């Protein structure tokens, strides 16, 4: 599973996931399923934010081409992917600026258009079950919940899905691709079932075979959202090398 994750996800997402696990004292060599889950969640949070802006009229727009004359504000503030201290600093700043109620738990995003924090969930189970678990934990009407599954289902607070259909379809397609690639390599069952995960771990420890070539469909581009996070965790040389025009994504 670890080899699959390193080949399936953008290296910067992998590095952020490694840092998150280290912060909580978790061993990615052992908790390989959690490693995969964290990478998946990070990518979906960044995809949720990508290309969404607020124009001068306060309208939400999707922009995929760089227009230097456009005065745009990022619609979403990304909280997920930051270390806890920085994340809470961002949350406190948002609350002080907007008057939003401070959440009890760290959310994933803040939506400047709807003026609300957002909790993103990615589940291998039924979406309604995971939604209820999230809602019972958060216990706040001020945090919007949006759950995605690997089967294309989704559920959101008051059926308000925030994003346009195309943006959500992009997320669902990516999740379905991850599921298919795991299944092709015999990893999906262990990703879903704890019992199967233990069997897979024993198998992985015995044989450290590299994951066979992934499909060319898997994007290796740098998410615009990741570019925002770069300065907080990348050294200056790597940051300089990757710093490009915000909305110009390299294509293969």
Curated annotation (Swiss-Prot):
The protein's name in its UniProt record? Protein PA-X
Keyword Nucleotide-binding tagged:
no
Tell me which residues are marked as the site Important for efficient shutoff activity and nuclear localization: 195, 198-199
Q: Could you list this entry's UniProt keywords, alphabetically sorted.
A: Decay of host mRNAs by virus, Eukaryotic host gene expression shutoff by virus, Host cytoplasm, Host gene expression shutoff by virus, Host mRNA suppression by virus, Host nucleus, Host-virus interaction
Active site per database record: 80, 108
Q: Which organism is it from?
A: Influenza A virus (strain A/Udorn/307/1972 H3N2)
Q: Which family does the similarity line name?
A: Belongs to the influenza viruses PA-X family.
Look up the domain of life of the source.
Answer: Viruses
Give the location in the cell: Host cytoplasm; Host nucleus
Question: What is the UniProt domain comment for this protein?
Answer: The probable endonuclease active site in the N-terminus and the basic amino acid cluster in the C-terminus are important for the shutoff activity. The C-terminus acts as a nuclear localization signal. The C-terminus is recruited to host protein complexes involved in nuclear Pol II RNA processing.
Q: Which GO terms describe its molecular function?
A: RNA binding
Q: Where is this site: Important for efficient shutoff activity?
A: 28, 65, 202-203, 206
Q: Which InterPro entries match?
A: PA/PA-X, PA/PA-X_sf
Q: Is Iron-sulfur one of the keywords? A: no
Q: What does this protein do?
A: Plays a major role in the shutoff of the host protein expression by cleaving mRNAs probably via an endonuclease activity. This host shutoff allows the virus to escape from the host antiviral response. Hijacks host RNA splicing machinery to selectively target host RNAs containing introns for destruction. This may explain the preferential degradation of RNAs that have undergone co- or post-transcriptional processing.
Q: Please give the biological process terms from Gene Ontology that the record holds.
A: viral RNA genome replication; viral translational frameshifting
